[in-house]
């Protein structure tokens, strides 16, 4: 799922094709074989008082009408990709979109997933409460028709009651534990959330580190640190590693509106295998394989990856890695040369 902020040219002027950068993301998805769920981000204001965007934000900015046009054009772009591609929508946050537009998001975009930042930082909670007389989760629950289409990103500043009520809507909590730790945003209440049948997904919001195993490890360790417990997310029949991996797979499938997460007829063949010949996994079986990968290994143990049956990683190396890395280095050199 690509939470896509950047839409316009420097200075905030739209490209001739308003969905030009969505087109670039589609091209990248095609080259890498990723099963793309594109989430164009609607970002209009710099705060709840509807102040203007800063110079660093104007390439994100769209009125609601222009955003609808962008979304429509981006949808056309995706028709050229494989059929496991889909599109949703992402009103950035309660601070960045007009209050009347927020209330209508579910009806204005009647299909596809909806992702939005919610209750990420203390400052956000206080700003929303000052302007709208309610905490972010309180306001969203009362005004936005939360249901299983929604994925709320971070959710690190929720009260116990908010955690329970939001979990019971069927919405997914989209967690980015490395970023939330790096920025000091707070700790998601994963124990209370899962006790109330809440679904969660894992994302890599970080520009510091991108690693699935490390995101899962950080999620679990954060629960232990907050509550002073061990194996806080394990269940009697599933180890910690299996519990959080399967939870992330199930919630991620829901958040991306993708028929995946099971090796069954009718589901996309999204699969990965781990290198069990590695010393990190040697001799491990069953749940111990996942536990060792998440808590003692890293993503170098990922050996093979299939996306909707497309075999994109073989023996730990992406099939197009050579040309992608070479192009990336050339682009970095060009950018540095232009500074």
Predicted regions and their residues:
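Metal-coordinating catalytic core of metallo-dependent amide/deamination hydrolases
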Residues: 11-156
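Active-site microenvironment of metallo-dependent hydrolases
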Residues: 221, 243-339
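Anion (oxyanion) recognition and catalysis
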Residues: 30, 110, 167, 194-195
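His/Asp/Glu-enriched, well-ordered alpha-helical/loop segment
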Residues: 142-149, 191-280
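Divalent metal-coordination and catalytic microenvironments
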Residues: 29, 89, 117, 152, ...
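Short low-complexity, flexible loop/linker segments enriched in glycine and/or proline
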Residues: 15-18, 51-55, 129-131, 188-192, ...
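Catalytic beta/alpha-barrel core
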Residues: 149-159, 175-181, 203
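Histidine/acidic-residue-rich catalytic or RNA/ligand-binding cores of hydrolases
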Residues: 102, 122-136, 162-167, 184-193, ...
């Amino acid at each position: 799922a690509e939470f896509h902020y950047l839409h316009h040219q420097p200075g905030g002027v739209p490209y001739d094709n308003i969905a030009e950068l969505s087109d670039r993301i589609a091209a990248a998805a095609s080259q890498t074989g990723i099963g793309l769920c594109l989430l164009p981000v609607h970002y209009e204001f710099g705060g709840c008082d509807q102040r203007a965007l800063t110079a660093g934000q104007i390439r994100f900015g769209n009125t609601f009408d222009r955003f609808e046009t962008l979304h429509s054009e981006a949808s056309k772009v995706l028709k050229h990709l494989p059929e496991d591609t889909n599109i949703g929508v992402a009103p950035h946050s309660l601070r960045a979109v007009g209050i009347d537009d927020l209330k209508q998001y579910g009806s204005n975009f009647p299909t596809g997933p909806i992702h939005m930042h919610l209750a990420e930082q203390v400052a956000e909670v206080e700003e929303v409460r000052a302007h709208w007389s309610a905490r972010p989760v309180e306001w969203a629950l009362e005004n936005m028709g939360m249901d299983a289409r929604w994925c709320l990103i971070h959710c690190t500043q929720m009260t116990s009651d908010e955690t329970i009520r939001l979990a019971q809507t069927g919405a997914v909590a989209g967690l980015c534990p490395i970023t939330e730790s790096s920025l000091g945003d707070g700790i998601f209440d994963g124990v209370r959330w899962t006790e109330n049948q809440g679904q969660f997904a894992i994302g890599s919001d970080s520009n510091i580190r991108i690693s699935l195993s490390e995101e899962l490890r950080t999620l679990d360790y954060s629960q232990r640190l907050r509550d002073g417990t061990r194996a806080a997310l394990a269940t009697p029949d599933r180890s910690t590693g299996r519990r959080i991996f399967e939870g992330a797979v199930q919630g991620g499938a829901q958040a991306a509106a993708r028929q995946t997460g099971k090796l069954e007829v009718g589901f996309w063949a999204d699969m990965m295998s781990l290198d069990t010949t590695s010393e990190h996994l040697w001799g491990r079986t069953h749940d111990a394989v996942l536990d060792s990968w998440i808590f003692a290994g890293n993503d170098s143990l990922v050996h093979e990856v299939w996306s909707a049956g497309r075999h994109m990683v073989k023996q730990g190396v992406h099939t197009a890695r050579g040309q992608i890395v070479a192009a990336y280095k050339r682009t970095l050199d060009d950018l540095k040369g232009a500074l």
